[in-house]
């Protein structure tokens, strides 16, 4: 197979049009529109249907999988090479300067929620398969693309696909939902909640966060009977390197603290507005809730909760306080924890429970993933990336992020994020999420060769 970059480049305009159309299907999970036919709500259902109709347009076999996934198949061999992408996106959050569901292109960069996570990369893999089909390249194995609808909030889509529908697992697979060159290991992912009923003399209302796996970029609290001054609040914000607002009306106050959004697997890249707000309340008010939890949530290494841990193969545990609320006497804080393969999740959960004020609850736990980085499968994908990108410096890695790879076998994360943001892609889970057109083309070329070689190994 020669000149795959030219083959991908020839599809550039069509890919841009299709990606814009897909992004316009705003596909945040919406519980209010969930039904039997639309298990993740109307927006996600529309995005899955868009992909189904696009594949039918191009002559592929399509299965809608009870509304949980869109399955696209090329070939009839029982041995399957699989691509796992997703159509759902995280909530928007604040701070966008582009239309979030517009897909606008400026200076060869396409903006929109889902541009790089994960509609753009999934579409790149789809166009790679489309090129293979159109040019009738010989393939020994079936290639199947499965587009899920619930990656960002539990992966119930793939549970339904593999467990309920009993669809076959792949011989080889990859998900275009992380970084190049490739990810051969993923930390375990635990969601843990502290909750209970409490009467707080000062705190009347608290809200922050859009998802457990995102660093909150804003937090708001309503107080009654506060004793701090505006100067103290302003000084706190300056020292924290952030901004906020304060409204005072007699003995009542509304505080807002701004932070910086980031993916929950890399809390060090963000600034957690919720943990900062709790810190201020603990230091400058008599809030019993803040005083109990503030110091526990500050450090993203988990040291405040005695769960700090570092492993030889995957590095250190990280913790993100993703969601927090207090209303009508009920509080809830949800932690998103990424732990290495050497860390015992049972001990981790038990240790967290010891810090509960009322109730600690293990919400979910997904075990770590680890494949041999020296295997022929992984070395093949690495070689293809290096040959087409020219990048022989960046090494395969393990990550704290969780992808679809852990839901099946013989599957890793393979792109589509390029080192150092490629040509301008990024802001995953943040405002102005983007995908550079040049990265879209190169990613498509890499996936084209990868699918061809994996299907013929």
Question: Which residues fall in each region the model found?
Answer:
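Acidic/His- and Gly-rich active-site-bordering loop/insert found
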Residues: 1-113, 137-139
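An extended, acidic, His-containing surface patch that forms the Zn2+-binding/catalytic region
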Residues: 53, 265-328, 334, 338-347, ...
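Buried hydrophobic packing segments
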Residues: 122-132, 161, 223, 277-281, ...
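Midchain, well-structured core segments that form catalytic/ion-binding scaffolds
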Residues: 159-340
């Amino acid at each position: 197979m020669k000149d795959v970059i030219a083959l991908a480049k020839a599809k550039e305009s069509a890919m841009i049009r299709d990606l814009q159309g897909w992004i316009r299907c705003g596909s945040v999970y919406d519980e209010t529109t969930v039904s039997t036919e639309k298990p993740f709500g109307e927006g996600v259902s529309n995005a899955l249907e868009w992909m189904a109709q696009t594949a039918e347009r191009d002559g592929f076999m399509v299965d809608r999988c009870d509304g949980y996934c869109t399955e696209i198949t090329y070939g009839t061999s029982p041995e399957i090479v699989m691509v796992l992408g997703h159509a759902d996106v995280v909530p928007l959050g604040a701070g966008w300067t582009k239309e979030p569901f517009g897909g606008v292109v400026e200076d060869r960069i396409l903006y929109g929620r889902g541009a790089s996570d994960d509609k753009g990369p999934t579409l790149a893999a789809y166009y790679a398969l489309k090129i293979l089909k159109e040019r009738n390249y010989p393939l020994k194995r079936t290639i199947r693309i499965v587009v899920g609808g619930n990656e960002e909030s539990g992966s119930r889509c793939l549970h339904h696909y593999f467990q309920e529908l009993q669809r076959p697992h792949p011989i080889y697979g990859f998900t275009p939902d992380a970084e190049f060159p490739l990810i051969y290991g993923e930390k375990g992912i635990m969601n843990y909640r502290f909750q209970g009923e409490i009467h707080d003399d000062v705190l009347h209302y608290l809200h922050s966060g859009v998802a457990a796996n995102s660093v909150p970029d804003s937090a708001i609290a309503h107080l009654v009977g506060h004793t701090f001054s505006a100067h103290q609040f302003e000084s706190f914000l300056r020292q924290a390197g952030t901004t906020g607002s304060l409204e005072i009306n007699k003995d009542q106050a509304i505080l807002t603290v701004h932070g910086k959004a980031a993916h929950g697997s890399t809390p060090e890249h963000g600034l957690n507005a919720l943990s900062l707000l709790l810190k201020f309340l603990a230091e400058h008010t008599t809030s019993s809730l803040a005083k109990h939890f503030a110091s526990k949530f500050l450090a993203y290494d988990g040291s405040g909760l005695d769960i700090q841990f570092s492993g030889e193969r995957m590095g250190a545990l990280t913790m993100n306080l993703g969601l927090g609320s207090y209303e009508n006497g009920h509080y809830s804080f949800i932690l998103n924890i990424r732990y290495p393969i050497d860390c015992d999740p049972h001990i981790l959960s038990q240790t967290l429970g010891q810090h509960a004020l009322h109730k600690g609850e293990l919400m979910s736990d997904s075990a770590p993933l680890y494949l041999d980085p020296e295997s022929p499968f992984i070395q093949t994908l690495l070689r293809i990336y290096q040959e087409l990108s020219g990048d022989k410096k960046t090494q395969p890695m393990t990550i704290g992020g969780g992808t679809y790879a852990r839901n099946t076998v013989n599957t890793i994360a393979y792109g589509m994020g390029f080192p150092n943001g490629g040509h301008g892609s990024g802001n995953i889970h943040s405002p102005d999420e983007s995908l550079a057109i040049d990265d879209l083309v190169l990613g498509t070329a890499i996936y084209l060769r990868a699918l061809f070689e994996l299907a013929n190994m």
